[in-house]
């Protein structure tokens, strides 16, 4: 991969080389396996941390120097199925939620993590129980001996009462340490009640989403995540009202143009959402498990996708992002690393309070597969900070051979 980013003060060049191996298959009628190992090295004129061991957004453990970094990504798991039951054990990612630009509960942005996942599925119902081990870091640096682990446990119930309508409800719990409480191993336990029973020591969250299929090959969808909430002060700026929601709509074959798809989505995340006052915030390494926007932010986005032919796809994305950042020596909930009580303790925080940042985003991507499993991709990203009046242009050229 080759990338070139042009900013106001300078121009930087970035190169990345990835290689690996992927093996998958089945053993008998009920057992399957996947092993996908990829090792990557990135270098260029970009400024790197200059430390041997560290972590970065979207990555796990990384190593590097002043002008490069190296990291690997591994997905490896066994899966067994019998009638309506599926059991998966290994290292993988998860996606909970219908969002097209990001998911509030679990997204695929963090690196993969070790997990056990049990699913029961029928035509109208699917139940998922997830138990996973996460890695915790207080910042983007890493030192030997400073590693901490935490446990993620969650369950999700999806119901389709009608062929065109699906509802889902879920709970998540982050628990410190390597040992899991027995109460969280109960798939039908209400985790928030279990947390109260155990002394309110863990980080609980819950939510739901829906998808409704409409005529003209379209659908609407939405999701709500409740990190914490005070029903008596609902609708106010009370700091403990930590929640997020998104709403979207997508359409296929828009304007009767075959293979031309359109998607519109709005996401809104309250201050302090995803953060926690102990080492059980909602992150794996240094990456948010949920939406990449982070707290005290919103995004409105439009995506157009046109499949010109079988091997060629053109995609354009337009978006406007707003974020309320923490002022110096104050905490208004704009940083997942700073929970309530750090740098002051405001009891009332309005949405987008703080140092307001706005950005306009435009992305154009062309993907072409001239030969089977040989992919070419060119991507151009334009972003403009409307407050600071800074512009960034980024061009990425990607070459990939997949088995």
Describe each region flagged by the PLM.
Residues 1-166, 177, 234-243, 250-268, ...:
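Outer-membrane beta-barrel channel domains
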Residues 71, 161-173, 178-403:
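Exposed, low-structure sequence patches enriched in small/polar residues
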């Amino acid at each position: 991969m080759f990338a070139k980013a042009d900013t106001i003060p300078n121009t930087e060049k970035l190169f990345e080389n990835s290689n690996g191996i992927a093996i998958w298959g089945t053993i008998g009628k009920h057992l399957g396996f996947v092993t996908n190992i990829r090792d990557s090295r990135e270098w260029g004129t970009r400024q790197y941390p200059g430390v041997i061991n560290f972590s970065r957004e979207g990555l796990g453990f990384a190593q590097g120097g002043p002008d490069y970094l190296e990291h690997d990504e591994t997905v490896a798991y066994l899966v067994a199925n019998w009638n309506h039951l599926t059991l998966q054990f290994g290292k993988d990612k998860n996606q909970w939620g219908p969002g097209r630009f990001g998911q509030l509960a679990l997204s695929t942005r963090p690196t993969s993590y070790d997990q056990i996942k049990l699913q029961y599925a029928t035509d109208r119902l699917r139940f998922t129980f997830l138990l996973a081990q996460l890695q915790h870091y207080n910042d983007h640096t890493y030192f030997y001996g400073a590693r901490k682990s935490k446990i993620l446990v969650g369950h999700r119930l999806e119901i389709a009462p009608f062929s065109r309508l699906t509802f889902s409800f879920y709970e998540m719990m982050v628990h410190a340490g390597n040992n899991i409480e027995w109460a969280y191993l109960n798939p039908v336990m209400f985790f928030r009640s279990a947390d109260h029973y155990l002394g309110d020591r863990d980080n609980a969250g819950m939510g739901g989403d829906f998808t409704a299929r409409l005529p003209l090959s379209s659908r609407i969808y939405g999701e709500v995540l409740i990190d914490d909430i005070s029903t008596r002060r609902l609708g106010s700026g009370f700091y403990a009202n930590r929640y997020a929601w998104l709403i979207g709509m997508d359409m296929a074959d828009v304007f009767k143009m075959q293979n031309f798809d359109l998607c519109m989505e709005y996401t809104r995340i309250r201050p302090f959402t995803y953060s926690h006052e102990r080492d059980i915030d909602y992150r794996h390494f240094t990456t948010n498990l949920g939406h990449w926007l982070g707290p005290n932010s919103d995004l409105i986005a439009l995506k157009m996708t046109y499949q010109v032919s079988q091997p060629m796809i053109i995609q354009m994305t337009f978006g406007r992002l707003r974020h309320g950042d923490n002022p110096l020596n104050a905490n208004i909930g704009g940083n997942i690393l700073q929970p309530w009580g750090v740098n002051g303790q405001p009891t009332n925080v309005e949405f987008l309070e703080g140092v307001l940042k706005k950005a306009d985003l435009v992305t154009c991507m062309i993907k072409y597969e001239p030969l089977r499993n040989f992919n070419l991709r060119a991507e151009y990203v334009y972003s403009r900070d409307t407050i600071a009046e800074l512009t960034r242009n980024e061009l990425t050229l990607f070459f990939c051979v997949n088995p």
